[in-house]
From Swiss-Prot:
It comes from Vibrio cholerae serotype O1 (strain ATCC 39315 / El Tor Inaba N16961). Transmembrane segments: none annotated. Pfam families: PP-binding. PANTHER family: ACYL CARRIER PROTEIN (PTHR20863), CARRIER DOMAIN-CONTAINING PROTEIN (PTHR20863:SF76). 4'-phosphopantetheine is transferred from CoA to a specific serine of apo-ACP by AcpS. This modification is essential for activity because fatty acids are bound in thioester linkage to the sulfhydryl of the prosthetic group. NCBIfam families: acyl_carrier, PRK00982.1-2, PRK00982.1-3, PRK00982.1-4, PRK00982.1-5. This is Acyl carrier protein. The gene is acpP. InterPro entries: ACP, ACP-like_sf, PP-bd_ACP, Ppantetheine_attach_site. Carrier of the growing fatty acid chain in fatty acid biosynthesis. The modification O-(pantetheine 4'-phosphoryl)serine is found at residue 37.
Length: 78
């Protein structure tokens, strides 16, 4: 597991209050991890802060799974 992947999963566990074992790369934030729209906004904000990046709204809407978050950060982290 890459450092970015570990950090993303740690943020998801903290933000959504889920067990680390539930956080799989293919997990959907809403369907699998029980997030609501506010949770997803807060999750994006936490990712922006952790990785010192800005995620535009149109990109944030596409980040619906753990893997999508990892991929976005990997491609765009500074």
């Amino acid at each position: 597991m890459s450092n970015i992947e570990e950090r993303v999963k740690k943020i998801i566990v903290e933000q959504l209050g889920v067990d680390e074992a539930e956080v799989k790369n293919e997990s959907s934030f809403v369907e699998d991890l029980g997030a609501d729209s506010l949770d997803t906004v807060e999750l994006v904000m936490a990712l922006e802060e952790e990785f010192d990046t800005e995620i535009p709204d149109e990109e944030a809407e596409k980040i619906t799974t753990v893997q999508a978050a990892i991929d976005y950060v990997t491609s765009n982290a500074q």
